[in-house]
């Protein structure tokens, strides 16, 4: 089990509440597809794919993770199974996306996005990635 300090919980929940995370994740997806073009392969068959629509799905899952920070693995069990067994997403792609989300958050909050704050977000996303990758093991 991950230990969360009150400062970490506050940073993550306040940022989610006070930031247009759908825009942040849309921009992060667009960045990921541009910088790491092979990640687009999961969406090429979907002619109606738009980053903004998928961003809404991602943000919904992340909001749930924020609400259940102490039990993300249980929360993401079915989502992990879907990504592993049905979608066959390379789990390395999760790292690429979360790195791009952190870049977008840093750009948006440049005056207050310190290395310490980045560390909090790295920790949060490592927990999320571990949970969504659980069924791959």
Swiss-Prot record:
It holds the Pfam family Globin. Belongs to the globin family. It comes from Mustelus griseus (Spotless smooth-hound). GO terms for molecular function: haptoglobin binding; heme binding; metal ion binding; organic acid binding; oxygen binding; oxygen carrier activity; peroxidase activity. PANTHER family: HEMOGLOBIN FAMILY MEMBER (PTHR11442), HEMOGLOBIN SUBUNIT EPSILON (PTHR11442:SF7). Keywords: Heme, Iron, Metal-binding, Oxygen transport, Transport. Red blood cells. Involved in oxygen transport from gills to the various peripheral tissues. It comes from the Eukaryota. GO terms for biological process: hydrogen peroxide catabolic process. This is Hemoglobin subunit beta. Residues 3-137 form the Globin domain. One of its GO terms (cellular component) is haptoglobin-hemoglobin complex. Heterotetramer of two alpha chains and two beta chains. InterPro entries: Globin, Globin-like_sf, Globin/Proto, Hemoglobin_b, Hemoglobin_oxygen_transport.
